[in-house]
């Protein structure tokens, strides 16, 4: 459904084996990790036993969040997610009415997803699990109009926590309908942050490839820093590849990194968050942890 799906590489369109996942989560627990996101490089609810993944992490003291298009959020799946201890599901809804949604999400499912989100809100009420929604501005000349449409057609009637953003360019792979202020180019901070991005697939037939960030989606093979299928987290974190990426960011040699050189995350764009009713939500924060800003980890020394 997502317009980004067509650009994904076949080697990365896999399901992460549960045994491999458990090994990774066990390492994370030993390292003191408290929270993970489980969407990786695809739609998490295509994995019909995603609840087993969530429950394993929950039992290790690690909260799980997912980002989903919500199309597979049926009643059974909703109950399984809540019972497993999911912390938050963020539903991606691109398009403020049935017509726009069908165009941008490539499926006429606006009403279906709306009903399923409403039901999930009832099922998860008074539980540990929360739900929110994420939306994009489609025409930058009509920002205020689109905010009103999203609110009237989705956010306000559901009473859901939501955020509306301008589009980003997926590591330079797509043209966006607006230009960021390009006066100050700087590191995004991600190579230095206590943050690990693991894909389900990998190169050479492997699973659990580590890549620098979510924005390399569609060009992951260029950005592999190691594989947790046959390496430990510590080995990948301290690898030659990871340290070379950090050094390039320290020296601001972004043009030397093919998957970084045209990425719009190298520029500040505080106006890209155009509206939110989430308390304390601000530009630069992590999707879930509002205390976590990647720019705080930028190192130029």
Annotate each predicted stretch with a short phrase.
Residues 149-175, 286-301:
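Short, compositionally biased leader-like segments
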Residues 5, 210, 215-301:
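Flexible mid-to-C-terminal extensions adjoining Fe-S/redox cofactors in radical SAM and related proteins
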Residues 2-145, 151, 155, 161, ...:
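Radical SAM/AdoMet-radical enzyme domain recognition
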Residues 168-196:
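Structured beta-strand/loop patches that form or line metal/cofactor-binding pockets in enzymes
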Residues 136-138, 167, 201, 214-216, ...:
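Short, well-ordered beta-to-alpha junction loops that form the rim of enzyme active sites
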Residues 193-217:
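Active-site and channel-lining beta-strand-loop segments
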Residues 137-143, 161-179, 216-220:
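Flexible glycine/acidic-rich beta-alpha junction loops that bind and position SAM and/or redox cofactors
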């Amino acid at each position: 459904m997502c317009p980004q799906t067509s650009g994904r590489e076949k080697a990365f369109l896999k399901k992460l084996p549960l045994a491999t996942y458990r090994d990774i989560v066990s390492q994370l627990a030993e390292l003191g990790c408290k929270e993970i996101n489980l969407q990786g490089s695809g739609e998490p609810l295509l994995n019909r036993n995603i609840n087993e993944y969530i429950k394993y992490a929950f039992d290790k003291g690690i909260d799980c969040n997912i980002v989903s298009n919500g199309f597979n959020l049926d009643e059974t799946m909703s109950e399984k997610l809540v019972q497993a201890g999911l912390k938050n599901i963020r539903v991606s809804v691109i398009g403020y009415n049935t017509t726009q949604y069908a165009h941008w999400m490539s499926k006429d499912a606006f009403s279906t997803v709306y009903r399923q989100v409403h039901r999930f809100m009832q099922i998860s009420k008074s539980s540990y699990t929360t739900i929110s929604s994420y939306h994009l501005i489609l025409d930058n000349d009509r920002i205020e109009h689109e905010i009103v449409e999203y609110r009237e057609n989705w956010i306000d009637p559901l009473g859901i926590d939501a955020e509306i953003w301008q589009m980003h360019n997926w590591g330079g792979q797509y043209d966006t309908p607006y230009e960021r202020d390009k006066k100050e180019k700087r590191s995004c901070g991600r190579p230095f942050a206590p943050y690990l991005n693991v894909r389900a697939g990998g190169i050479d037939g492997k699973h659990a490839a580590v890549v620098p960030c979510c924005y390399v989606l569609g060009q992951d093979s260029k950005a592999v820093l190691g594989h947790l299928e046959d390496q430990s987290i510590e080995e990948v974190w301290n690898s030659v590849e990871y340290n070379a990426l950090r050094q390039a960011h320290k020296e601001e040699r972004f043009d030397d990194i093919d998957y970084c050189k045209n990425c719009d995350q190298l520029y500040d764009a505080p106006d890209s968050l155009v509206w939110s009713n989430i308390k304390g939500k601000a530009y630069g924060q992590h999707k879930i942890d509002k205390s976590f800003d990647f720019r705080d980890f930028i190192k130029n020394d």
